[in-house]
Amino acid sequence: MANISDYLDWRGDLDFSVSPFCEVDNLILSELAYVDFDGIVPGEDKRETITIQKACRDFFSLYSEEEILARTSTTKMAPFLMKKLISGRRFGSLMLGNYVNEIDMDSQRQFSAVCCYLGDGTVYVAYRGTDNTIVGWKEDFNMGFLCHTSGQRRAVRYLNDNFKGGCGRLRVGGHSKGGNLAVYASSFCEPDVQRRIQKVYTNDGPGFLPEILRDPGYRRILP
């Protein structure tokens, strides 16, 4: 069965003007959100960007492959995907920015997001899923019985703070909990932001309690 690596071998040399953005590209960027970009990708207060190629070089100048592989982590392979991305023209020159990585024990929140500027006039907003922290897993359990979690509210604020009043089209996605955050943020963001959302991707993301499913904001983003 073909995988992401096979896709990059097949399409990695074609930019988005030749082969438009597809669901596999979404999967790739949702996985990229698991890379620890602290000190590498500019934060949301910087209004600056960095290419994936440079982010990859900077990351591997800080961490060796042996060090990464020695980690006890379910997401430790994400940096190696990033290394694969820069071997072709499809992703290497894309710009990353608006990076956030927060752990808040009091609010029981593990939150991270990054934006990828695709060069086709759209931005992919990638929310990270659960990491290896205790608070991240506790937040997952909270999502099983709370309609609104601190992380979900933070996801809405992230989308509004970075894109309210703009004009570009948005793609919003994530893997696992990140997919849930993508749907929640797209449902409850400001109307002018929601109108610009081209597509929402939840890749193996958990669902919602009935109260959310009945909300008008959620129903507006349904395909």
Indicate where each model-derived feature is located.
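A conserved cap/lid and substrate-binding interface adjacent to the catalytic center
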Residues: 60-170, 191-197
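Short, conserved micro-motifs enriched in small and acidic residues
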Residues: 23, 149, 176
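Short loop/turn segments at secondary-structure transitions that flank enzyme active sites
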Residues: 35, 129-133, 206-209
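Serine-dependent carboxylesterase/thioesterase catalytic core
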Residues: 152-223
